[in-house]
Amino acid sequence: MPQSFKELGVAKWLSESLEAMKIHSPTSIQSACIPEILKGRDCIGGAKTGSGKTIAFAALMLTQWSQDPFGIFGLILTPTRELALQIAEQFAALGALMNIKVCVVVGGEDFVKQTLELQKKPHFVIATPGRLADHILNSGEETVSGLRRIKYLVLDEADRLLSNSFGSDLQRCFTILPPSEKRQTLLFTATVTDAVKALKDKPRAEGKLPVFLHQVDAGVDQIAIPKTLSTMYVFVPSYVKEAYLTSILKLPKYEESTAVVFVNRTMTAEVLRRMLRKLEFKVASLHSEMPQTERTNSLHRFKAGAARILIATDVASRGLDIPTVELVVNFDIPADPDDFIHRVGRTARAGRKGDAISIIGEKDIERIESIEERINKKMELLEGVDDDKVINDSLQKATTAKREAMLDMDKESFGERRKVNKKKRAVEEPSGKRQQKKVKKVKS
């Protein structure tokens, strides 16, 4: 395997940038994919979270761009706003020496500002399909014309993008792009699903090289959890889950650890955030009902160490670069075993040890059995937390804090704000049309 990025064909200036960022040797997915993509092949790259997929496509795109630096050179589509912002940060850091221009096109940000940035033809656009589709529909040819010349299209977390929920928006995005024979298409994912794999065998345009498919550490059914990850569980009645959570977070082993606590619902995330703050934990949250500025600030606080605990829905479980997490807690058990694997992929990265603890009740047993079958590993019983300890140390305080948190949310009409936010999203396209009128006024 190549020992340096220079051996892979990465530009000298970029190799130096990687060295400056303490990224010395390419990972398996980078070593396999970069040379093949530089040959002109489309690519499907499958590797578990934390294996360096972003650099695998960013390094080669920046290498090629530096030889012909026009805009818009590449489009990266990704399912979440947070992931788009993170990818943009990595592009900006890698391309700092060459003064690259990156535009992020996601919901929750100023539509007019995005329109003006797109009109300036940035070198790279990183977008969520819904917001980019909105611009294609409503912002006019001057705004999106640069997308007609792109050399690279990247679908990051391709398994999610190819699901039904993104179908119509993705198709609309494709209408503005060059035909497949005039661009390279790169798909990267932690889960190489049948839908992703089927793209390899689609008919190719004349002269197009075969698609390159590479999977790393596929393990059982295409996904493996890190070998340095310990998976544990605690079996509890549902009405004392919060007390068990606080007891786990106060264990001597974890009292100073960074932790991500995953939940299935935004309401649960908000209750836990407020409850844990009342119990004097340093906590932040990340869920879809938060305004974009709050979500960004929460992630920055957690990364900077201002918050030790991040309460998150699955919006945070895919691809987000939170390298120092030592503990993952599944407060709620996901219905899909793959979501469990992506969640626990937040810890035990790059050979470091990490723990994943699942708080389970009677209704979760079937889900846990499916997860254990998927990862080919039995979870171990968590030691150090039992009924007596929880009753004596945490139950009353957690119950009181939860009740106060829910009363606060009721006073602030949190549930009503959720309904308003849903209505806003439902009328997003008409909103885009209104914003288009504002753009015309700005230009006139």
From Swiss-Prot:
UniProt-listed InterPro entries: DEAD/DEAH_box_helicase_dom (IPR011545), DEAD_box_RNA_helicase (IPR050079), Helicase_ATP-bd (IPR014001), Helicase_C-like (IPR001650), P-loop_NTPase (IPR027417), RNA-helicase_DEAD-box_CS (IPR000629), RNA_helicase_DEAD_Q_motif (IPR014014)
Helicase C-terminal domain: residues covered: 244-390
UniProt-annotated location(s): Nucleus, Nucleolus
Stretches assigned to coiled coil: none
GO MF terms, alphabetically ordered: ATP binding; ATP hydrolysis activity; RNA binding; RNA helicase activity
Sites where the protein binds ATP: A47, K48, T49, G50, S51, G52, K53, T54
Keywords per UniProt: ATP-binding, Helicase, Hydrolase, Nucleotide-binding, Nucleus, Ribosome biogenesis, RNA-binding, rRNA processing
Helicase ATP-binding domain location: 34-210
SMART domains (alphabetical): DEXDc (SM00487), HELICc (SM00490)
Biased composition (Basic and acidic residues): 402-418
Top-level taxon of the source organism: Eukaryota
Motif (DEAD box): 156-159
Sequence motif: Q motif, positions: 3-31
One of the GO biological process terms: endonucleolytic cleavage in 5'-ETS of tricistronic rRNA transcript (SSU-rRNA, 5.8S rRNA, LSU-rRNA)
Catalysis: reaction(s): ATP + H2O = ADP + phosphate + H(+)
Family the entry assigns: Belongs to the DEAD box helicase family. DDX49/DBP8 subfamily.
Domains: entry comment: The Q motif is unique to and characteristic of the DEAD box family of RNA helicases and controls ATP binding and hydrolysis.
Protein name: ATP-dependent RNA helicase DBP8
Gene, per the UniProt record: DBP8
